């Protein structure tokens, strides 16, 4: 008799995706972040659902409903902080996942890579709208500043902003629609994840060497299910440590003040995971130029498969490219730091130099360096 997991129409899909999936025998811990992102998405959807049961998307009661969740709802405080810090964990895993894709040349699977970029945009949009919902000072002013950037679009800009706001300023209509979008987007993300995995399973996983590994595969279960379970344990430990010991470590104190349109906070800044893009936005003195740079800071990932000039796929055996990759990482950390600083000397010039270096590295230096390494192979 055939095993049910190999014959049942639904179980067969699960079997081919998680159990009998042929996987490269040498993929390292850097390949754990895909499953960790799945775990993060699951945590966010479950905690978000429970929060939505008690939250009210009205400007008069939103702030107090979040307070009510923390004070009066059974275990409301832990659900709220798991959701808030879960977002930080989500982005840590996202950045490491994308970084691994760049380092090991996984972007050459262009369909999987492009769906991944769409996912990144969707997660960023969801996180931004989620930050607006508690209706604190930083929520309100963050929403005002970021949505206002769309007014830089020629001709339709002003109408577009008012259409998104649902009026002439960020108000009740804005909060209600942000709540609606924040609720629906994670399910769209989950659907995109399925497409992401569909394309990945068409080609199979890459591995650290970047060499085709068809001759050396092992079943996903039990080898990588155990490995992923260990990753889950690490992630949950880190998340619970953050939630139980310092839940507000990554938040902004200004968001504990109810939104006041008449009083601007001294430094308007987004959550830490957007600071690198915010620094790029601020480094360009022109509004439209800044908005374009902001979008391109993520969209530039789409040109990476086109700029791959190396004869080798992975950076594992390319020391010069490795050096440039780690300069890029350091540059992104610098941009993150600058994004949280006030707009004054010397932060302005540091931000401009770091923004220039970011685009220069990806568009010019890394492809040129790959060509030089191709020449060195012949020596």
UniProtKB/Swiss-Prot annotation:
PROSITE patterns: CYTB_CTER (PS51003), CYTB_NTER (PS51002). One of its GO terms (molecular function) is ubiquinol-cytochrome-c reductase activity. One of its GO terms (cellular component) is respiratory chain complex III. InterPro entries: Cyt_b/b6_C (IPR005798), Cyt_b/b6_C_sf (IPR036150), Cyt_b/b6_N (IPR005797), Cytb/b6-like_sf (IPR027387), Cytochrome_b (IPR030689), Cytochrome_b_C_euk/bac (IPR048260), Cytochrome_b_N_euk/bac (IPR048259), Di-haem_cyt_TM (IPR016174). It is found in: Mitochondrion inner membrane. Heme b b566 binds at residues 97, 196. Heme b b562 binds at residues 83, 182. GO terms for biological process: mitochondrial electron transport, ubiquinol to cytochrome c. Its cofactor is heme b. The keyword Mitochondrion applies. Pfam families: Cytochrom_B_C, Cytochrome_B. Binds 2 heme b groups non-covalently. It is a multi-pass membrane protein. A ubiquinone binds at residue 201. The keyword GTP-binding does not apply. Keywords: Electron transport, Heme, Iron, Membrane, Metal-binding, Mitochondrion, Mitochondrion inner membrane, Respiratory chain, Transmembrane, Transmembrane helix, Transport, Ubiquinone. The chain crosses the membrane at residues 33-53, 77-98, 113-133, 178-198, 226-246, 288-308, 320-340, 347-367. Heme 1 (or BL or b562) is low-potential and absorbs at about 562 nm, and heme 2 (or BH or b566) is high-potential and absorbs at about 566 nm. Component of the ubiquinol-cytochrome c reductase complex (complex III or cytochrome b-c1 complex) that is part of the mitochondrial respiratory chain. The b-c1 complex mediates electron transfer from ubiquinol to cytochrome c. Contributes to the generation of a proton gradient across the mitochondrial membrane that is then used for ATP synthesis. The cytochrome bc1 complex contains 11 subunits: 3 respiratory subunits (MT-CYB, CYC1 and UQCRFS1), 2 core proteins (UQCRC1 and UQCRC2) and 6 low-molecular weight proteins (UQCRH/QCR6, UQCRB/QCR7, UQCRQ/QCR8, UQCR10/QCR9, UQCR11/QCR10 and a cleavage product of UQCRFS1). This cytochrome bc1 complex then forms a dimer. Belongs to the cytochrome b family. This is Cytochrome b. The lineage of its organism: Eukaryota, Metazoa, Chordata, Craniata, Vertebrata.
